[in-house]
Amino acid sequence: MKVRILFLICFLSITCLLNAADKPVIQIHTDNSSLIFRVADNGRLYQSYLGKKLNHEADISHLPQGTEAYITHGMEDYFEPAIHILHNDGNPSLLLKYVSHETKAVSQGVNETIITLGDDKYPVTVKLHYVTYPAEDIIKTYTEISHKEKKPVVLHQYASSMLHLNRAKYYLTEFSGDWAHEANISDQPLEFGKKVLDTKLGARANMFTPPFFQLSLDQLATENCGEVLVGTLGWTGNFRFTFEVDNKNELRIISGINPYASEYYLPAGVVFRTPDFYFTYSANGKGKASRNFHDWARRYQLKDGDETRMTLLNNWEATYFDFNEEKLIGLIGDAAGLGVDMFLLDDGWFANKYPRSSDHQGLGDWDETADKLPNGIGRLVEEATKKGIKFGLWIEPEMVNPKSELYEKHKDWVIHLPNRDEYYFRNQLVLDLSNPKVQDFVFGVVDKIMTENPDVAFFKWDCNSPITNIYSPYLKDKQGQLYIDHVRGIYNVLKRVKEKYPNVPMMLCSGGGARCDYEALKYFTEFWCSDNTDPVERLFIQWGFSQFFPAKAMCAHVTSWNSRTSVKFRTDVASMCKLGFDIGLKDMKADELTYCQEAVANYK
């Protein structure tokens, strides 16, 4: 009898081990967090855990099955799915089962786990990628979708990430705002139902809400206490975060491109890659989470993240559009006297048939205005070099004024609706970057400037309009792809610029802080937080952005805004970020100028 019992115990143990081997547990760890998946008896992938790092196998083995990791449309789930596909035969469903997974080293200290899922009825493959940066406690995730059906399938939803949490309470911190009023922090509890943060603006996508959030677990986290999950999407276009609490008080977070008006026709054999979603978990408050992002960005994501930044003097508030060569040469001398590294020439230097004397005309015609700059940009670069400083230049190459030669010659390059009156934002329209010819033109703006003036040392790349009049002459019957292909076209241009001019730093700007994502910051060394430079209000704006971005990535200038405050206070606030000046130095008192000179020297 004892022998039979022992045999039965051994048999059951072996059976359990074999079953466990058939149903893998996939562990993804950073130094202080864990994300655990397991394959269930039905062959589907489930997220069992997300939170503080689990160090013992016994803890992992006793985790519950959890919730399906990447929920599909059309099956038994009752809430928001991560993916929705329409097959060739009209079937709108997808059932994903585990196929395989692998973990590999990407670089020293960075690992990637790839989980492959497939539909058992249709030849559709979905790969979930998880890249870990252990020391910084950052996980990057994205999704790849492909198929082998005879004709293109239609993608209606295609999330970068789906995460599940099961806690008593959830508190969302969002960062909403508007022009000159960016990154306002507000907290709210999440209860049954759905909360959506999204944008449909296209080019100037983050004007009302930026692509990041904080989520406190169980109680509202403070700077140094509490559990918090912090996430951001690397996408310079329409995004959507969906937070849905279900009938069991379980929360799903779906992050990715906003699928609004963006059904995507995916041909067989082509891989649709979603943007990257980055997140970190902290058990020690929001401050630790923000420092995780700062450390990671400097080491891995931000262009020249470990390099110093150039201080500068911008001419905008001193001149606006009213300047000539003589006046600018004087300002270059002022910049040198201040001690900054660079003089930055802002808007107003280009176009001849329709000279850029205001924001109503000239945008798109990137030749120097002969009346203002008879000797071109080259003369200004020479003068800056003589003074021992660098020269930088403002451009807005993705945009066009209807009153321009570019618009007259290439209206087919412009996003605009047929048979409709045009609606303008800041008197301009957006060029169609889904069109390869337009991509060549935009790259050519930078390339021509650099070819003719190789000592130009910096670009301020602006983007002042969202997409209006939404129609692409180039895409024709594929209008649903415009919001996506337009952003991909921007990236194509930026990659070419970075490859040809790797040592030229650039500032990302969009009427203030309406562009601020980590995919764009692969190509830019810094971004402009806000056109609001009132130092009191700037403190709050900079605090909001600092939750995600390191100080060296955020530009802040000393200006005449709120001149009731002292120059010292304005300079101190600007010095919290990447320091610049945008003020008429000749209007300063002698002691104020002296203080600024000392501040620049100390900053450098």
Where in the sequence are the language-model features?
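Polysaccharide-binding surfaces and accessory modules of carbohydrate-active proteins
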Residues: 22-37, 45-244, 260
